[in-house]
């Protein structure tokens, strides 16, 4: 401790297994660690944390702001048990109007903003983006096809026929007129919605005056589409151009943070977060820690409105400004429209937490009922449900969904592409054996046996208490065989769910090792619960299978040629029209394409000749 500097920095606490227990930052590392070492005046949470700590690591930073930024990054990477943790860390979707093309398209975008174009958002959910794009298609008739599809069109697609696209691909609209539609869409998404609507209304009136009722109807439908977008946005503030609004509510040992996004004076939606935090932490401490993690990988607006003052608010403001590259104001409004926005978010936080508490209570009763029904030693904390999906053995996949005390845990879902070539097409038993073997081999390798998890009852377990299989005695037998070969058959309870003779819901038969098949009463809540779990696994497996099948269907033969990337593929398809035409082309014809050298032309030619 004597060697620790009196500098700002970040420290990490580790337990005997090498797991990170806590990540913290300090203005003075030496003083902070000395405070821990005194061992008096600490809360129960800190006392437990110190008791489990066997070693610490330190990173010295130049400023406390740097320390705060590094702390947020390390918390998200290692997810320590004693820190406040965001449960849902998905990036937010944006609307992208592409650039660098004669006919820009409108798309949903998530992730790094590396593609050229104009980005609008963030939106609270992919559903909100989808609804907005759908309405903007009707209003501005912008294309949503990929560039490769656009370049190879020889006639308008169905979207043109149903008036969702103006078909710039086949010049049904001039580039100049299409650019006008793009400009209107940008203006609407930039907050100039009223001027765009006024322009469309004037055009509709002019068309009506000229007795051009067909065009007047087009303008009318476009106006209706824009009104539809705004009707789904709820409140649109008059005095707030760009802001994120955070409101926190705590009740029953749980926390809800409601976040609203306002951009260009428009409400782009909201999302409720339920961070994992010790019940001893107050709202100011939880909200402050949440803010630092929230903006670790997300752009920060110029204004952040809070329902209450957070700890180290000035330091957080400085850190957000540093990360964003512009001045950020963090405030707790006391009056006016900004105060109303915060109150609206707070109301939503209370309601969302109330619903979550009710769901959690109901879930606990169902888990206890499941334990009693199937003779489990305790209510399961982790349930895994498995299902397979394929068509005559093709594009076969296995799906695993996970549920626990708080419902479905979607970030734990896993998909398995069936790899084995020894499995007969359509052999569901063989597919299930492969899925279970791959899942539990990795589980044993990464986490060992479930015995060590008892030390950390607050963490979501990696080992399942129960696995549910969509199938009967044969499926359960296949699973038990694999688990037995791995020496872990006594660690997991396997239950098979088979539909009745008529495959009607409510007549399911259940299969367990050492028991006769049995059914549950038709109105049993546990039966409904298991049906919901099975249906979710079925939905996930089918969705995964469809995605794989779709990918297989759109795969282009040019993708198999080394050195042919998106740019060269697009150039070849634009010139020849189809991959089949490329396969028939002579080397001299291929060399006429920009980016195709003689060596590449021969590689393409030889690839198709060798088949």
From Swiss-Prot:
InterPro entries associated with the record: GIY-YIG_endonuc (IPR000305), GIY-YIG_endonuc_sf (IPR035901), GIY-YIG_UvrC_Cho (IPR047296), Hlx-hairpin-Hlx_DNA-bd_motif (IPR003583), RuvA_2-like (IPR010994), UVR_dom (IPR001943), UVR_dom_sf (IPR036876), UvrABC_protein_C (IPR050066)
One Pfam assignment: UvrC_RNaseH
Keywords annotated in UniProt: Cytoplasm, DNA damage, DNA excision, DNA repair, Excision nuclease, SOS response
Domain annotation UVR: ranges: 194-229
CDD domains: GIY-YIG_UvrC_Cho
Family: Belongs to the UvrC family.
Primary location: cytoplasm
Compartments reported by the entry: Cytoplasm
NCBIfam families: PRK00558.1-5, uvrC
Example of a GO biological process term: nucleotide-excision repair
GO cellular component: cytoplasm; excinuclease repair complex
Gene: uvrC
Subunit structure, interactors included: Interacts with UvrB in an incision complex.
Domain GIY-YIG, first and last residues per copy: 6-84
Domain of life: Bacteria
Gene Ontology molecular function terms on file: DNA binding; excinuclease ABC activity
Coiled coil: none
Protein name per Swiss-Prot or TrEMBL: UvrABC system protein C
The protein's role, per its UniProt record: The UvrABC repair system catalyzes the recognition and processing of DNA lesions. UvrC both incises the 5' and 3' sides of the lesion. The N-terminal half is responsible for the 3' incision and the C-terminal half is responsible for the 5' incision.
Cross-referenced PROSITE patterns: GIY_YIG (PS50164), UVR (PS50151), UVRC (PS50165)
């Amino acid at each position: 401790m004597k060697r620790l500097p009196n500098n700002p920095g970040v420290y990490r606490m580790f337990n005997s297994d090498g797991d990170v227990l806590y990540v913290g930052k300090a203005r003075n590392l030496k003083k902070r660690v000395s405070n821990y070492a005194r061992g008096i005046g600490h809360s129960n949470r800190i006392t437990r944390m110190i008791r489990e700590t066997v070693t610490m690591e330190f990173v010295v930073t130049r400023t406390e702001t740097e320390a705060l930024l590094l702390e947020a990054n390390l918390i998200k990477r290692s997810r320590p048990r004693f820190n406040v943790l965001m449960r849902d860390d998905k990036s937010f979707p944006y609307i992208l109007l592409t650039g660098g093309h004669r006919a820009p398209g409108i798309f949903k975008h998530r992730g790094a903003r590396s593609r050229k174009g104009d980005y609008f958002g963030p939106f609270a959910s992919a559903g909100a983006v989808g609804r907005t794009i759908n309405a903007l298609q009707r209003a501005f008739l912008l294309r949503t096809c990929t560039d490769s599809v656009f370049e190879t069109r020889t006639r308008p697609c169905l979207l043109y026929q149903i008036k969702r696209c103006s078909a710039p691909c086949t010049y049904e609209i001039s580039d100049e007129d299409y650019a006008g539609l793009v400009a209107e869409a940008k203006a609407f998404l930039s907050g100039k919605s009223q001027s765009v609507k006024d322009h469309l209304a004037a055009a509709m009136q002019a068309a009506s005056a000229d007795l051009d009722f067909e065009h007047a109807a087009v303008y009318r439908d476009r106006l209706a589409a824009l009104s539809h977008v705004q009707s789904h946005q709820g409140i649109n503030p008059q005095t707030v151009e760009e802001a994120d609004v955070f409101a926190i509510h705590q009740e029953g040992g749980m926390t809800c943070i409601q976040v609203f996004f306002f951009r260009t004076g428009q409400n782009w939606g909201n999302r409720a977060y339920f961070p994992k935090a010790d019940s001893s932490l107050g709202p100011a401490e939880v909200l402050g820690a949440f803010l630092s993690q929230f903006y670790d990988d997300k752009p920060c607006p110029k204004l952040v409105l809070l329902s209450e003052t957070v700890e180290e608010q000035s330091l957080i403001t400085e850190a957000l400004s540093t990360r964003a590259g512009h001045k950020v104001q963090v405030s707790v409004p006391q009056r006016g429209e900004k105060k109303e926005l915060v109150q609206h978010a707070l109301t939503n936080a209370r309601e969302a937490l109330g619903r979550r508490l009710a769901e959690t209570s109901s879930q606990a009763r169902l888990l206890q009922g499941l334990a009693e029904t199937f003779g489990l030693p305790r209510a399961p904390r982790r349930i895994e449900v498995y299902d397979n999906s394929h068509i005559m053995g093709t594009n076969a996949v296995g799906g695993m969904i996970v549920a626990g005390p708080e419902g479905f845990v979607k970030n734990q879902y896993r998909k398995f592409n069936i790899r084995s070539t020894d499995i007969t097409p359509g052999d569901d038993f063989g597919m299930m054996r492969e899925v279970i073997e791959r899942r539990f081999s990795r589980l044993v390798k990464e986490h060992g046996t479930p015995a060590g998890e008892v030390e950390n009852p607050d963490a979501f377990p990696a080992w399942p208490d129960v696995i549910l299989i969509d199938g009967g005695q044969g499926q359960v037998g296949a699973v038990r065989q694999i688990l037995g070969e791995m020496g872990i058959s006594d660690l997991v309870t396997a239950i098979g769910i088979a539909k009745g003779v008529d495959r009607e819901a409510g007549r399911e038969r259940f299969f367990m090792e050492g028991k006769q098949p049995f059914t549950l009463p038709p109105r049993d809540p546990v039966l409904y619960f298991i049906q919901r779990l099975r249906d979710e696994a079925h939905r996930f497996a089918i969705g995964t299978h469809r995605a794989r099948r779709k990918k297989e269907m759109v795969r282009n033969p040019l993708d198999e040629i080394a050195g042919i990337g998106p740019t060269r593929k697009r150039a070849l398809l634009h010139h020849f029209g189809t991959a089949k035409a490329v396969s028939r082309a002579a080397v001299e014809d291929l060399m006429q394409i920009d980016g195709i050298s003689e060596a590449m032309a021969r590689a393409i030619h030889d690839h198709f000749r060798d088949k």
